[in-house]
């Protein structure tokens, strides 16, 4: 069993942490905000448009001009696998106009709830208000992370990890 750090508590980070923990790793999830999934709350006007239910080839045609760089990722875990994953967590979904997939409740908070429940079931250590300042390396491999926690006023804490997943998100809404 190895120690894995996941940087970023958005959808990708929460899923990465769940999957790593499900594969037997000891996982710590670092999120700089006060709660997980902050950006999820605002997607789809607060309803959380999870994915699109169209065929994979149609998905590529609709969203990308040059999608080749995404082929291996999408064919490994496509939109239908994502829907199956959330269904397995107990999230009821519905498909609307344009094949858009939403939680049946129309509440993004339900998506965050099922992911957070899964993190707890998998015993993922969650560090909120904690900013990873550096991924530490010995020159050949990752050895840990250096983090600061706003809540506990801990600064420059270096913690050893065998692997690090960076799921830091984008800057579409920089305040999230």
Predicted segments with their positions:
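Redox-cofactor binding/interface segments in oxidoreductases and associated redox assembly factors
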Residues: 7, 42, 166-167
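Hydrophobic/aromatic ligand-binding patch that stacks against planar heteroaromatic rings
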Residues: 15, 19, 40, 164
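Predominantly flavin-linked oxidoreductase catalytic cores and closely associated redox partners
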Residues: 109, 114-176
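Phosphate-coordination loops involved in phosphoryl transfer and adenosine-cofactor binding
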Residues: 1-3, 96, 129, 161
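Residue-level detector of alpha-helix initiation sites
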Residues: 10-12, 35, 170-172
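Mobile amphipathic helical/loop "lid" adjacent to a hydrophobic cofactor/ligand pocket
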Residues: 15, 19, 23, 34, ...
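N-terminal Rossmann-like FAD-binding beta1-loop-alpha1 element of flavoenzymes
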Residues: 2-29
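Conserved N-terminal/central alpha/beta ligand/cofactor-binding core
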Residues: 32-125
């Amino acid at each position: 069993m190895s120690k894995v750090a996941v940087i970023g508590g958005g959808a990708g980070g929460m899923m990465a942490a769940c999957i790593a923990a499900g594969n037997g790793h000891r996982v710590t999830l670092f999120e700089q905000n006060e709660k997980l999934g902050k950006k999820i709350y605002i997607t789809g006007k607060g309803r959380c448009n999870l994915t699109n239910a169209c065929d994979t080839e149609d998905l590529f045609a609709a969203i990308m001009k040059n999608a080749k760089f995404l082929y291996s990722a999408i064919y490994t875990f496509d939109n239908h696998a994502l829907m199956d994953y959330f269904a397995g967590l107990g999230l009821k979904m519905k498909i609307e106009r344009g094949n858009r997939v939403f939680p049946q409740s129309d509440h993004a908070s339900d998506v965050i709830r099922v992911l957070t429940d899964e993190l707890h079931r998998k015993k993922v250590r969650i560090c909120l208000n904690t900013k990873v300042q550096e991924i530490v390396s010995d020159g050949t491999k990752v050895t840990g992370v250096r983090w600061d926690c706003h809540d506990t006023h801990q600064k420059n804490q270096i913690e050893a990890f065998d692997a690090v997943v960076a799921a830091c998100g984008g800057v579409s809404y920089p305040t999230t």
